[in-house]
């Protein structure tokens, strides 16, 4: 079969026959690339179970030579894609039936070629938790993000993201391309959430500092992290870090910019140029093509390639959908094969399990774009213009590009598991006297890991001057469930007259009386006694009043924003962005605590 026949397209039956005939009597392949391509890509056109049935039928009707070639093909299929046989029980059972049928007919030589029982378990590829054995006691500063060596932080981020990347299978890419979202695709959904989590965490770590000098120091540290990521050839996390540093919530901080050195600016500009989307990410593609050894692709770029191919080229070469478009199959295979080959490489880093637990919890604490931007405004308020009545349009995130709509909230059960592990790690590393409690002095070290952690006495529920494991776990779980893993607002309380019984959200007792005996938040509507106000642990979640340009109510869809840098020129670390006019809000002031 020459190349012209392939260009015209082939039916599935023709391709199956071609794959079988690619094996000689000694089991050697004449066209291994084509066979591997079809075995990887076949779920795009036919379920794996149906392919197994076709092979069984051909084995039943064929002669001894053809049966042996079929068994060689099945053997090659299992060796190249073992996870498919473990994670698809129906497929595994059909191959066992084929093996038993061969044995029953006395074809033991052919039957022995099929060894499905040796396939290891790949259940870990469908799990979205970050698991690891507990390590020994390490130096305390290894868990302090303010003092953590940038190279060490880059290595741990690489370990965390690559572990998530290694779980992605062909079926995940296929589902994403077909549906344009991650519905029913938790592994890819988790990976994208982690990508966005790194970007948001960087913004929050910068904004957690109260002075421009401190924020500039954090930015410098993350630029150094980005440099190390480039050395590791980890382009995916590099893109997330660069996206976080170039987000509008950071780029608008002009006072902070003035404290960033020209050297740091130059390094950051070079990273932005590398990841620019100009000429379809040409600079990134050239750099990635020269990589040797471990390399972690910027998955967002390659997913865009898959989406573009799927939209531009048809799956089938005929209207009846019987002839496969081989040209499209080859191009899609090239993209996916490059990703799967990268998954086979182990990152040259060693990770501390305790630090991974802390990072996992930190990256899972979701905030909205609006909340982060409001915190940015709190750090450096807008400069008022002379035109007080006119409002400038909101500034977009300059180097970020919204390109995928996917979305999900963090899994509360998994988050609770991470919280429990994190608390164990904190006590093992920061409970210096080993008394099972965190003192106020030890708490200051813990707080360096969580800049939005509330005050000591709010976690110390029994007010005995020390925090137990139960109290810390309870706090994080309460914050996770009540606040939905989001930062809140300070309540804007006003005295109210209640004409019917209302419960206090702190103590649970009724607020009695008609002469302004209670308080009610103007923003979220929560109620409490006056004397309970300062003890209220529930933060304000402002009720949405957002409407579209058409005046319709806008509900947040279920989507992730997997963001990639755009093409743009820069002479400084951040562009000169035009600020919006301040909006008068009487509902509340943004609070930067968890």
Swiss-Prot record:
Transmembrane segment boundaries: none
Taxonomy of the source species: Eukaryota, Metazoa, Chordata, Craniata, Vertebrata
Organism (species): Xenopus laevis (African clawed frog)
Binding-site list for Ca(2+) 1: 431, 433, 435, 437, 442
Acidic residues bias spans: 582-594
Protein name: RAS guanyl-releasing protein 2-A
Residues the record lists as binding Ca(2+) 2: 460, 462, 464, 466, 471
Span of domain Ras-GEF: 149-382
Molecular functions (GO terms): calcium ion binding; guanyl-nucleotide exchange factor activity; zinc ion binding
Cited Gene3D superfamilies: 3.30.60.20, EF-hand (1.10.238.10), Ras guanine-nucleotide exchange factors catalytic domain (1.10.840.10), Son of sevenless (SoS) protein Chain: S domain 1 (1.20.870.10)
Job of this protein: Functions as a calcium- and DAG-regulated nucleotide exchange factor specifically activating Rap through the exchange of bound GDP for GTP. May function in cell aggregation and adhesion.
Location relative to the cell: Cytoplasm, Cytosol; Cell membrane; Synapse, Synaptosome
Zinc finger (Phorbol-ester/DAG-type): 490-540
